[in-house]
Amino acid sequence: MKINFSLLDEPMEVNLGTVLVIEDVSVFAQLVKEFYQYDEQSNLTIFDSKIRSIRSSELLLITDILGYDINTSQVLKLLHTDIVSQLNDKPEVRSEIDSLVSLITDIIMAECIENELDIEYDEITLLELIKALGVRIETKSCTVFEKIFEILQIFKYLVKKRILVFVNSLSYFSKDEIYQILEYTKLSQADVLFLEPRQIEGIQQFILDKDYILMPYNN
């Protein structure tokens, strides 16, 4: 994946945990705005190896790690489908669940017989049962470090998202934690950009200095 904007001499490659530091505060703020308002006609361009522009729906922008809701409808749909698939691979467990659902249905319908109204019902599917149970990802006890890993893991689920951008996020973490985060992005083979307003000690990064010169830097 590559990005380009007016101050770059040429497009910049983004892959496997690229860190871009922008020292000019006003430029940093403007670029964050460009990402936030990104569409195919914006000054900021994001495109793949085939020079195909990335749609706004394919960009996942995170400006607040703890405030990001992992349990979106899209994530839950994928999670529930994945659980159904796992259960289908275990015939004994699936059979036990079906038997219990049938038993519960019989009990409820037996009670409904006394009702004066004519009552009918639909059989509940395994997917509907999982939804009804409110199955979701637990996030209440997350630290910032745990939450960013959950976001990175969720990004793999979101097949329609092609690039993940974190804004001003690495300042929350120690050197060792940053190393673990970047290592995980490499192992995940994910296109992830960390957009930062200041240099990060001890890691490889690209710095757009106040003279608007982009240089690789490893301190």
Curated annotation (Swiss-Prot):
The keyword Disulfide bond does not apply. GO terms for molecular function: DNA binding; metal ion binding. Its cofactor is Ca(2+). It comes from the Bacteria. Keywords: Antiviral defense, Calcium, DNA-binding, Metal-binding. Ca(2+) binds at residues 138, 150. Disruption phenotype: Plasmid transformation is still inhibited. One of its GO terms (biological process) is defense response to virus. Homotetramer. CRISPR (clustered regularly interspaced short palindromic repeat) is an adaptive immune system that provides protection against mobile genetic elements (viruses, transposable elements and conjugative plasmids). CRISPR clusters contain spacers, sequences complementary to antecedent mobile elements, and target invading nucleic acids. CRISPR clusters are transcribed and processed into CRISPR RNA (crRNA). Binds dsDNA. When the CRISPR3/cas system consisting of cas9-cas1-cas2-csn2-CRISPR3 or just cas9-CRISPR3 is expressed in E.coli it prevents plasmids homologous to spacers 1 or 2 from transforming. Belongs to the CRISPR-associated Csn2 protein family. This is CRISPR-associated protein Csn2. The lineage of its organism: Bacteria, Bacillati, Bacillota, Bacilli, Lactobacillales. The gene is csn2.
